[in-house]
């Protein structure tokens, strides 16, 4: 398995691997909520956000153009609690990811405190690379092609 070193500036740009590998430096990434960006192959990506304590109804995913935005707004706690130690954070957040061209949200699941967003690259057939078969002419075909009396040249 490969690890891709994305600079902090481009951590939220998904599908721009060549661009990301050429850029250096950047800004501090957002600390909450923690998330992973996984690349399983050239056409499949997954964003996983750790959202312990959130309910599915408190989360919203929106795609507008190339921007994927994930928002969370926890419901207020009815009874105030005095924490001796607070390690779990439940605060409002908004994360925006910039998706590469032809990268679309395929699926989203919230399970065991993790929000998984699956992305799929779907390049139209007309834009995909084409393989051209290279053939070799038989000796008889070569004579026809090299002949000055070929039917095309009259």
Curated annotation (Swiss-Prot):
Highest taxon of the lineage: Bacteria
GO CC term, one of those recorded: cytoplasm
GO biological process, one term: protein stabilization
Entry keyword annotation includes Chaperone: yes
Record flagged with keyword Hydrolase: no
Entries under SUPFAM superfamilies matching the protein: HSP20-like chaperones
Key words of the record: Chaperone, Cytoplasm, Stress response
Entry's free-text remark on domains: The N- and C-terminal flexible termini are involved in oligomerization and in the binding of non-native substrate proteins, and are essential for chaperone activity.
Subunit structure: Homodimer. Forms homomultimers of about 100-150 subunits at optimal growth temperatures. Conformation changes to oligomers at high temperatures or high ionic concentrations. The decrease in size of the multimers is accompanied by an increase in chaperone activity.
Protein name: Small heat shock protein IbpB
Source organism of this protein record: Yersinia pestis
Gene: ibpB
């Amino acid at each position: 398995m490969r690890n891709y070193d994305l600079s902090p500036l481009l951590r939220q740009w998904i599908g721009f691997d060549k661009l990301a590998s050429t850029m250096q430096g950047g800004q501090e990434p957002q600390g909450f909520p923690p998330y992973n960006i996984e690349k399983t192959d050239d056409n499949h990506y997954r964003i996983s956000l750790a959202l312990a304590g959130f309910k599915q109804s408190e989360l919203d995913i929106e795609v507008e153009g190339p921007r994927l935005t994930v928002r969370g707004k926890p419901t207020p706690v009815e009874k105030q609690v005095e924490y001796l130690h607070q390690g779990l954070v439940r605060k409002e957040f908004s994360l925006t990811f910039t998706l590469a061209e032809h990268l679309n949200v395929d699926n989203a699941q919230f399970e065991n405190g993790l929000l998984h967003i699956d992305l799929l690259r779907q390049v139209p057939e007309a834009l995909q690379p084409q393989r051209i078969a290279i053939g070799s002419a038989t000796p008889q075909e070569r004579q026809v092609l090299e002949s000055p009396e070929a039917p095309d040249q009259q």
